[in-house]
Amino acid sequence: MGRRCIEELVEFRQQLYNCLPRWSDALFELTDAALCASGPVTSVPSLSLEPEFTRSHGSLYKALAKGRIDGDRLRRLLVDAAPKDWPLVFAVDASTWDRCDAECSPERGFYYSASKHSAGQPIVAGWSFQWICQLCFAPDSWTAPVDARRITPKEDTADATIDQVRGLVELLRDDGEVPLFVFDAGYDPIALAHGLSDARAQVLCRIRDDRVFYTDPPPRPNRPKGTGGRPPRHGRRMKCSDRRTWGKPSETLVMTDPRHGRVTVTAWHGMHPKLCGRSRWAAHERPPIVKGSIIRVEVEHLPKPTTRTKKTLWLFWSGPGTPNLDACWRAYLRRFDIEHMFRLAKNTLGWTSPSLCTPAQAERWTWLVVAMLAQLRLARRHVDDLRLPWERPREPAQLTPVRTRRGFRRLRAVIGTPASPPKYTKAGPGRPKGTRSPPRTRYPAIKKAA
């Protein structure tokens, strides 16, 4: 088992090298330098000082500026390398690479940021990247990133998400299991459900507790044609915050969880909202009827002591058949693992640390970070546990991503690298004497129309 897993890591590294058509050696050594660095990556140029990067810092800059990554091939590689024993449950979320002061960087947009403010508002200018990570139900923070895409300011977030999910579904194995995609409350569940209605996918999205939904209208008695007016499109009204309007649930699940105590999951199937003929529905002759299941999750207590008293969660599900209530509420709680992945990518691997100029360079660096995360997951059972004196010993299967990264340098010395050694040459002539570079073009951040 162990030998087969390490062979998978070696094969993944070779295939990753094949996904780099231009500046492959420098780009691959850049990933090794970031994985083998002794501390968090705070400066990408400093990675050229790591022994795993055998080239100069100039090659590092040129690799990010002029290199090329085959995104389609790398996406297929990530899907094939994902754990086969994990369920087809995926978390989808976007994170912002803030570039507030980068006036020379094009295609910046304004995005919400909970930790950084601009002019007193939680809004920053930068690039938005949407990640898709496969989740597991094991009690750890490991995820398997399978895709990352930059959403431009001119794109509609819902349309971009639908295209990204469709592209991933085409790459997944078709063994009868329908993939479940979990979204936070910032996404439009109705738009996603409508756009993915003909895809092999389930959509699970958190909704506010003041949303209103409707049942199907009751059947009308037979009447002569041309009498009775237009038939109703909506039935009984259900407001999530008003218990009196709920009606009889379609399905109820009660269980006991060691972390949350008594868990009650209630579902109402065949519900739909009342849509207006504007925004994305303006092109429709009549707003569509988008049906789904409303799921209410109530827990006895939260895992840790907190001042928060709200212990109720509302979800909207859509997909073929009816939802698996036990899988739905557990999948949404595991969705928060993608937040841990973002923290690892930013604080440890330095995803948003480099001050890159163009979005194309940012996309290349993002793909490299995704490849780093995949290598850490494949190497978790083969690295030495270089724990700090105050840390408890762990079994190889229980190592965290950060502790796995500490031992990657020793493992890399054993498995080697597919990158070729550098070819030494003399320095070039440089810039002709007396020439000056013209001022660079300024690009204002794009404000998306409401």
Give residue spans per PLM region.
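A generic secondary-structure signal
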Residues: 50, 77-80, 167-172
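Single, function-defining residue in the core of a domain
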Residues: 1-23, 103, 139-450
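Short low-polarity hydrophobic stretches
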Residues: 47, 93, 132-134, 203, ...
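Gly/serine-rich nucleotide phosphate-binding loop at the start of the catalytic core
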Residues: 1-65
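Generic alpha-helix structural propensity
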Residues: 26, 39-42, 55, 59, ...
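Short secondary-structure transition/capping motifs
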Residues: 36, 49, 62-67, 117-122, ...
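Active-site-proximal, Lys/Arg-enriched surface segment
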Residues: 62-140, 145, 284
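Contiguous, well-ordered alpha-helical segments that form the cores/surfaces of helical PPI scaffolds
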Residues: 32-34, 133, 369-373
